[in-house]
Curated annotation (Swiss-Prot):
Residues 107-118 have a biased composition (Low complexity). Keywords: Carbohydrate metabolism, Cleavage on pair of basic residues, Disulfide bond, Glucose metabolism, Hormone, Secreted, Signal. The lineage of its organism: Eukaryota, Metazoa, Chordata, Cephalochordata, Leptocardii. GO terms for biological process: glucose metabolic process. Residues 1-22 form the signal peptide. It is found in: Secreted. This is Insulin-like peptide. Residues 115-305 are annotated as: E. One of its GO terms (cellular component) is extracellular region.
Length: 305
Protein backbone atom coordinates (compact mmCIF):
# COMPACT_ATOMS: atom_id res chain seq x y z
CA UNK A 1 0.00 0.00 0.00
CA UNK A 2 1.52 3.27 -1.06
CA UNK A 3 1.19 6.60 0.61
CA UNK A 4 -1.42 7.93 -1.79
CA UNK A 5 -3.84 5.16 -1.00
CA UNK A 6 -3.46 5.90 2.72
CA UNK A 7 -4.44 9.54 2.17
CA UNK A 8 -7.49 8.49 0.19
CA UNK A 9 -8.70 6.17 2.91
CA UNK A 10 -8.09 8.80 5.57
CA UNK A 11 -10.05 11.40 3.64
CA UNK A 12 -12.96 9.03 3.18
CA UNK A 13 -13.03 8.32 6.90
CA UNK A 14 -13.11 12.04 7.69
CA UNK A 15 -15.99 12.60 5.24
CA UNK A 16 -17.99 9.79 6.80
CA UNK A 17 -17.49 11.21 10.25
CA UNK A 18 -18.59 14.65 9.09
CA UNK A 19 -21.76 13.27 7.49
CA UNK A 20 -22.55 11.32 10.64
CA UNK A 21 -22.10 14.40 12.78
CA UNK A 22 -24.43 16.44 10.59
CA UNK A 23 -27.27 13.86 10.76
CA UNK A 24 -26.93 12.96 14.44
CA UNK A 25 -26.53 14.83 17.69
CA UNK A 26 -25.44 14.20 21.21
CA UNK A 27 -28.45 14.42 23.54
CA UNK A 28 -28.21 14.33 27.31
CA UNK A 29 -30.23 15.27 30.37
CA UNK A 30 -33.29 17.53 30.02
CA UNK A 31 -32.52 18.14 26.34
CA UNK A 32 -32.90 14.42 25.64
CA UNK A 33 -36.15 14.27 27.61
CA UNK A 34 -37.60 17.28 25.75
CA UNK A 35 -36.65 15.86 22.35
CA UNK A 36 -38.18 12.46 23.18
CA UNK A 37 -41.38 14.12 24.43
CA UNK A 38 -41.61 16.02 21.16
CA UNK A 39 -40.91 12.91 19.01
CA UNK A 40 -43.16 10.48 20.90
CA UNK A 41 -45.97 12.88 21.78
CA UNK A 42 -48.82 11.31 23.76
CA UNK A 43 -47.42 7.78 23.36
CA UNK A 44 -44.58 8.26 25.84
CA UNK A 45 -41.23 6.50 25.72
CA UNK A 46 -39.27 3.84 27.56
CA UNK A 47 -35.60 3.30 28.40
CA UNK A 48 -35.20 0.34 26.01
CA UNK A 49 -35.72 0.69 22.26
CA UNK A 50 -38.40 -1.26 20.41
CA UNK A 51 -36.96 -3.93 18.14
CA UNK A 52 -38.39 -6.15 15.45
CA UNK A 53 -39.55 -9.73 16.07
CA UNK A 54 -36.57 -11.28 14.28
CA UNK A 55 -34.05 -9.41 16.40
CA UNK A 56 -36.04 -10.20 19.53
CA UNK A 57 -36.04 -13.91 18.56
CA UNK A 58 -32.29 -13.85 18.14
CA UNK A 59 -31.92 -12.29 21.57
CA UNK A 60 -33.86 -15.09 23.24
CA UNK A 61 -32.62 -18.20 21.40
CA UNK A 62 -31.24 -20.91 23.55
CA UNK A 63 -27.66 -22.11 23.57
CA UNK A 64 -28.61 -25.49 22.09
CA UNK A 65 -30.38 -23.79 19.20
CA UNK A 66 -27.32 -21.64 18.56
CA UNK A 67 -25.10 -24.69 18.47
CA UNK A 68 -27.47 -26.47 16.09
CA UNK A 69 -27.68 -23.58 13.63
CA UNK A 70 -24.25 -22.02 13.86
CA UNK A 71 -22.18 -24.65 15.56
CA UNK A 72 -21.34 -22.31 18.46
CA UNK A 73 -23.06 -19.76 20.71
CA UNK A 74 -23.31 -16.49 18.80
CA UNK A 75 -22.31 -13.22 20.37
CA UNK A 76 -25.53 -11.56 21.57
CA UNK A 77 -25.13 -7.81 21.84
CA UNK A 78 -26.33 -6.36 25.10
CA UNK A 79 -29.07 -3.83 24.69
CA UNK A 80 -27.85 -0.34 25.27
CA UNK A 81 -30.00 2.07 27.14
CA UNK A 82 -31.28 5.44 26.03
CA UNK A 83 -28.56 7.43 27.73
CA UNK A 84 -25.78 5.17 26.52
CA UNK A 85 -26.94 5.32 22.92
CA UNK A 86 -27.89 9.00 22.61
CA UNK A 87 -25.70 10.73 25.18
CA UNK A 88 -22.46 8.79 25.00
CA UNK A 89 -22.92 8.23 21.28
CA UNK A 90 -24.99 10.05 18.70
CA UNK A 91 -28.51 9.06 17.63
CA UNK A 92 -30.76 10.31 14.85
CA UNK A 93 -34.54 10.66 14.57
CA UNK A 94 -35.15 7.02 13.66
CA UNK A 95 -33.23 5.87 16.71
CA UNK A 96 -35.14 8.25 18.94
CA UNK A 97 -38.45 7.05 17.50
CA UNK A 98 -37.54 3.46 18.40
CA UNK A 99 -37.76 4.38 22.09
CA UNK A 100 -41.38 5.56 21.77
CA UNK A 101 -44.21 3.33 22.91
CA UNK A 102 -46.41 1.82 20.16
CA UNK A 103 -49.66 3.48 19.11
CA UNK A 104 -52.77 2.26 20.83
CA UNK A 105 -54.99 0.34 18.41
CA UNK A 106 -57.99 0.25 20.75
CA UNK A 107 -60.67 2.75 19.68
CA UNK A 108 -61.33 5.58 22.03
CA UNK A 109 -64.45 5.15 24.12
CA UNK A 110 -66.88 7.77 22.98
CA UNK A 111 -69.15 9.36 25.53
CA UNK A 112 -72.68 8.10 24.91
CA UNK A 113 -74.97 10.85 23.70
CA UNK A 114 -78.47 10.96 25.08
CA UNK A 115 -81.07 11.42 22.41
CA UNK A 116 -84.61 12.41 23.29
CA UNK A 117 -87.39 10.85 21.30
CA UNK A 118 -89.77 13.34 19.70
CA UNK A 119 -92.97 13.57 21.64
CA UNK A 120 -96.15 13.09 19.59
CA UNK A 121 -98.22 16.21 19.31
CA UNK A 122 -101.66 16.18 20.83
CA UNK A 123 -104.35 16.13 18.19
CA UNK A 124 -107.17 17.10 20.53
CA UNK A 125 -109.06 20.22 19.58
CA UNK A 126 -109.41 22.91 22.20
CA UNK A 127 -113.08 23.90 22.53
CA UNK A 128 -112.01 27.46 23.35
CA UNK A 129 -109.52 27.72 20.49
CA UNK A 130 -110.08 30.85 18.46
CA UNK A 131 -111.35 32.95 21.36
CA UNK A 132 -108.74 35.67 21.61
CA UNK A 133 -108.59 39.07 23.18
CA UNK A 134 -111.50 40.14 25.35
CA UNK A 135 -113.60 37.19 24.22
CA UNK A 136 -111.40 34.63 25.94
CA UNK A 137 -112.73 33.67 29.41
CA UNK A 138 -110.52 33.65 32.48
CA UNK A 139 -109.03 30.20 32.96
CA UNK A 140 -110.47 26.92 31.72
CA UNK A 141 -113.96 25.50 31.81
CA UNK A 142 -113.28 24.07 35.28
CA UNK A 143 -112.41 27.54 36.56
CA UNK A 144 -115.57 29.03 35.08
CA UNK A 145 -117.56 26.85 37.46
CA UNK A 146 -115.86 28.47 40.44
CA UNK A 147 -115.99 32.07 39.25
CA UNK A 148 -118.82 34.56 39.69
CA UNK A 149 -119.76 36.29 36.45
CA UNK A 150 -122.13 39.10 35.68
CA UNK A 151 -123.13 39.79 32.11
CA UNK A 152 -124.40 43.13 30.86
CA UNK A 153 -126.51 41.84 27.98
CA UNK A 154 -127.51 38.38 29.15
CA UNK A 155 -127.47 36.13 32.19
CA UNK A 156 -126.54 32.48 31.75
CA UNK A 157 -126.02 29.82 34.37
CA UNK A 158 -122.65 28.37 35.24
CA UNK A 159 -123.84 24.85 34.47
CA UNK A 160 -124.62 25.83 30.89
CA UNK A 161 -121.16 27.32 30.54
CA UNK A 162 -119.62 24.10 31.80
CA UNK A 163 -121.61 21.62 29.72
CA UNK A 164 -121.76 23.59 26.49
CA UNK A 165 -118.48 25.45 25.84
CA UNK A 166 -119.45 26.11 22.21
CA UNK A 167 -122.66 27.75 23.37
CA UNK A 168 -120.61 29.92 25.71
CA UNK A 169 -118.44 30.94 22.78
CA UNK A 170 -121.51 31.98 20.77
CA UNK A 171 -122.92 33.95 23.68
CA UNK A 172 -119.66 35.72 24.37
CA UNK A 173 -119.34 36.60 20.69
CA UNK A 174 -122.87 38.05 20.57
CA UNK A 175 -122.33 40.64 23.29
CA UNK A 176 -122.19 44.28 22.29
CA UNK A 177 -119.15 45.02 24.42
CA UNK A 178 -117.57 41.66 23.42
CA UNK A 179 -116.60 40.62 26.90
CA UNK A 180 -117.87 39.08 30.08
CA UNK A 181 -117.29 41.20 33.15
CA UNK A 182 -116.18 39.18 36.18
CA UNK A 183 -117.50 40.61 39.43
CA UNK A 184 -114.21 39.86 41.17
CA UNK A 185 -111.37 37.87 39.67
CA UNK A 186 -111.08 35.08 42.21
CA UNK A 187 -114.29 34.94 44.28
CA UNK A 188 -115.15 31.26 44.57
CA UNK A 189 -118.60 29.97 45.41
CA UNK A 190 -120.36 26.73 46.21
CA UNK A 191 -123.10 25.24 44.07
CA UNK A 192 -125.88 26.76 46.22
CA UNK A 193 -124.49 30.31 46.11
CA UNK A 194 -125.29 32.80 43.41
CA UNK A 195 -124.57 36.52 43.16
CA UNK A 196 -127.06 39.29 43.68
CA UNK A 197 -128.47 41.01 40.62
CA UNK A 198 -127.65 44.68 40.30
CA UNK A 199 -130.32 47.14 39.14
CA UNK A 200 -128.17 49.47 37.04
CA UNK A 201 -125.52 49.14 34.35
CA UNK A 202 -122.67 50.19 36.66
CA UNK A 203 -123.24 47.37 39.12
CA UNK A 204 -120.55 45.12 37.67
CA UNK A 205 -117.90 47.55 38.85
CA UNK A 206 -118.51 46.72 42.51
CA UNK A 207 -118.12 43.39 44.33
CA UNK A 208 -121.30 41.57 45.32
CA UNK A 209 -122.51 39.71 48.35
CA UNK A 210 -122.77 35.97 48.10
CA UNK A 211 -126.27 34.89 49.16
CA UNK A 212 -126.93 31.31 50.24
CA UNK A 213 -129.94 29.91 48.45
CA UNK A 214 -131.46 26.54 47.91
CA UNK A 215 -131.00 25.03 44.43
CA UNK A 216 -133.95 25.97 42.25
CA UNK A 217 -134.91 25.52 38.63
CA UNK A 218 -136.05 29.07 38.07
CA UNK A 219 -135.61 30.55 34.63
CA UNK A 220 -133.20 33.50 34.41
CA UNK A 221 -134.73 36.87 33.84
CA UNK A 222 -134.82 38.13 30.30
CA UNK A 223 -132.97 41.37 29.47
CA UNK A 224 -136.29 43.07 28.75
CA UNK A 225 -137.34 42.88 32.38
CA UNK A 226 -135.98 46.13 33.68
CA UNK A 227 -135.71 46.64 37.44
CA UNK A 228 -138.42 48.85 38.78
CA UNK A 229 -138.52 50.97 41.87
CA UNK A 230 -141.14 48.67 43.44
CA UNK A 231 -138.80 45.66 43.09
CA UNK A 232 -136.02 47.59 44.79
CA UNK A 233 -138.12 48.34 47.83
CA UNK A 234 -139.24 51.80 46.75
CA UNK A 235 -142.87 52.48 47.64
CA UNK A 236 -144.25 55.33 45.68
CA UNK A 237 -146.11 57.77 47.87
CA UNK A 238 -149.73 57.71 46.83
CA UNK A 239 -151.31 61.03 46.21
CA UNK A 240 -152.76 62.45 49.31
CA UNK A 241 -156.42 63.25 48.71
CA UNK A 242 -156.45 65.51 51.68
CA UNK A 243 -155.43 69.05 50.93
CA UNK A 244 -152.39 70.08 52.98
CA UNK A 245 -153.07 72.90 55.30
CA UNK A 246 -149.61 74.36 55.70
CA UNK A 247 -146.69 74.74 53.29
CA UNK A 248 -144.24 73.79 56.00
CA UNK A 249 -145.88 70.39 56.49
CA UNK A 250 -145.83 69.83 52.73
CA UNK A 251 -142.12 70.51 52.53
CA UNK A 252 -141.36 68.20 55.45
CA UNK A 253 -143.47 65.39 53.97
CA UNK A 254 -141.78 65.73 50.59
CA UNK A 255 -138.33 65.64 52.18
CA UNK A 256 -139.25 62.52 54.15
CA UNK A 257 -140.53 60.80 51.02
CA UNK A 258 -137.36 61.56 49.13
CA UNK A 259 -135.24 60.25 51.98
CA UNK A 260 -137.18 56.99 52.21
CA UNK A 261 -137.27 56.43 48.46
CA UNK A 262 -133.62 57.16 47.85
CA UNK A 263 -132.29 55.16 50.79
CA UNK A 264 -131.08 51.76 49.68
CA UNK A 265 -129.01 49.54 51.90
CA UNK A 266 -125.59 49.34 50.23
CA UNK A 267 -123.82 46.03 49.67
CA UNK A 268 -121.24 44.96 52.18
CA UNK A 269 -117.72 45.53 50.89
CA UNK A 270 -114.69 43.91 52.59
CA UNK A 271 -112.04 46.17 54.04
CA UNK A 272 -109.33 45.12 51.60
CA UNK A 273 -111.64 45.94 48.69
CA UNK A 274 -113.05 49.21 50.04
CA UNK A 275 -109.56 50.74 49.91
CA UNK A 276 -109.36 50.09 46.18
CA UNK A 277 -112.91 50.94 45.16
CA UNK A 278 -114.87 54.08 45.96
CA UNK A 279 -118.23 52.81 47.10
CA UNK A 280 -121.20 54.78 45.85
CA UNK A 281 -124.95 54.28 46.32
CA UNK A 282 -126.22 51.98 43.64
CA UNK A 283 -129.38 54.05 43.11
CA UNK A 284 -129.51 57.81 43.15
CA UNK A 285 -132.93 59.28 42.59
CA UNK A 286 -133.18 62.77 41.18
CA UNK A 287 -134.06 65.45 43.58
CA UNK A 288 -136.13 68.53 43.00
CA UNK A 289 -138.27 71.08 44.73
CA UNK A 290 -141.87 70.02 45.34
CA UNK A 291 -144.54 72.03 43.66
CA UNK A 292 -148.21 72.25 44.15
CA UNK A 293 -150.42 71.18 41.26
CA UNK A 294 -154.10 71.92 41.48
CA UNK A 295 -156.53 69.40 39.96
CA UNK A 296 -160.24 68.89 40.06
CA UNK A 297 -160.30 66.43 42.93
CA UNK A 298 -157.24 67.08 45.06
CA UNK A 299 -153.74 68.51 45.24
CA UNK A 300 -150.85 66.27 44.27
CA UNK A 301 -147.38 66.56 45.67
CA UNK A 302 -144.86 65.51 43.03
CA UNK A 303 -141.16 65.86 42.39
CA UNK A 304 -139.47 67.47 39.47
CA UNK A 305 -137.17 65.25 37.47
Amino acid sequence: MNLSSVYVLASLAVVCLLVKETQAEYLCGSTLADVLSFVCGNRGYNSQPRRSVSKRAIDFISEQQAKDYMGAMPHIRRRRGLVEECCYNVCDYSQLESYCNPYSTAPATATPVRTTEPQPEEAEDDPLDGMVGDQAPLGSIENIENLVYHYDSDDITIDAAKMEPKKLKEILGSFEDKKANPVFPFIRQSKNIKPNKFPDSFAHQFPTDLVEEEPTNEIPESPSQKPTLERLGYKHNQTDKKEPTENNNNNNRARDNRTKSSTVEPHTVPDYISKQYTHKPLITLPRGTPRRIESRDSYHLTELR
